[in-house]
Amino acid sequence: MTDRATPNLPSRDFEITSAFYGELGFTSVYRSDDWMILRRGEVVLEFFLYADLNPATSGFSCCLRLDDLDAFYATCRDAGIRETTRGWPRLHPPATEDSGLRIGALIDPDCTLLRLIAND
């Protein structure tokens, strides 16, 4: 197995989290009472149960580095996630930043920020 790191993200409710990410093509590969692992291709997200999380004050985030940012973004839009600046879940469209990186954003139902970064 290749060395790797995976983000550990909060979930107030595994059913809601699993359904949300399932619409984006993620499948469950492990679940217990307090831990869940979802996979979409080579992208693995691990979730811990955090029932008392206040999404409005959550500072959790991670980066998804994607070979096809546009396709993943389209999947998010097709799942009904809106481009807006308020509430969650929500999307922010990809744009080229000063760094030269093309980055969008997905905010999940627990207000976790997933930066969507196009691979070179």
Protein language model regions, located:
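Short glycine-enriched loop/turn motifs at secondary-structure junctions
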Residues: M1-D3, N54-G59, E97-D98
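N-terminal beta-strand motif that seeds the catalytic metal site of vicinal oxygen chelate
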Residues: M1-E15, C62, I117-D120
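Short aromatic/hydrophobic contact patches that present stacked aromatics
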Residues: T6-N8, I37, S61-C63, I103-A105
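Conserved active-site tyrosine of GNAT-family acetyltransferases
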Residues: T17-G22, C111
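Vicinal oxygen chelate
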Residues: L64-D110
